Amino acid sequence: MGSVQDENKDEFKQSLTRGKLKPSSSSSFRLRSPSLNSIRLRRIFDVFDRNHDCLISVEELSQALNLLGLDADLSEIESMVKLHIKPENTGLRFEDFETLHRSLNDVFFGSKCEDKLGLNPDPAQDESDLKEAFDVFDENGDGFISAKELQVVLEKLGLPEGSEIDRVEMMISSVEQDHDGRVDFFEFKDMMRTVIVPS
């Protein structure tokens, strides 16, 4: 016998798959390493929590999704948030956000994906994921990430590093090896491999 909450979750999952957000075969947003998963989710939570009250409100979640180009209906977001918070809270605490993330992983990628937990790492898939991430930053498709392109993405994500071009240029120069002021895919891969260490 299913509860009203289970019915609401099923209804929300169906509305997601009917809307703009579709299940994808890409695993770019599946975080495989459990320890990195929690760290990354915490960083995302902190970015979404604009007023730093340790809660993500419906409005904050809506703004974050819009900045990422994922236009979602406000009433659907409100329904989703209500499914994952305790009645006395006005928004998602970090623990609620983790639960929401797990449920969205189940909707989009299936709950039986072993590689979601890092059990079946696939180097070819990792390479594909890195290329996909690189392409997000390489807005003009020239095969390089310029300081301006990096700044645009950081600003869209609401990260403070994107506010000053000097800071962005320093980030680029710390990664690029041939001193041309931009990052190619191989430099990007090296950077990501030094940042993401298997647990």
UniProtKB/Swiss-Prot annotation:
Q: Which Gene3D superfamilies match?
A: EF-hand
* Segments passing through the bilayer: none
Q: Spell out the residue ranges making up region: Disordered.
A: 1-31
Q: Which SUPFAM superfamilies match?
A: EF-hand
**Molecular function (GO) terms listed?**
calcium ion binding
Report domain EF-hand positions. 36-71, 75-110, 125-160, 163-198
Record field: compositional bias (Basic and acidic residues)? 1-13
* PROSITE patterns assigned: EF_HAND_1, EF_HAND_2
Query: Where Ca(2+) is bound, by residue?
Result: 49, 51, 53, 60, 138, 140, 142, 149, 178, 180, 182, 187
InterPro entries hit by this protein: EF-hand-dom_pair, EF_Hand_1_Ca_BS, EF_hand_dom, EF_hand_pair_protein_CML-like
Domain of life, per lineage = Eukaryota
Which UniProt keywords are listed? Answer: Calcium, Metal-binding, Repeat
Q: What does this protein do?
A: Not known. Probably binds 3 calcium ions.
Q: What is the protein named?
A: Calcium-binding protein CAST
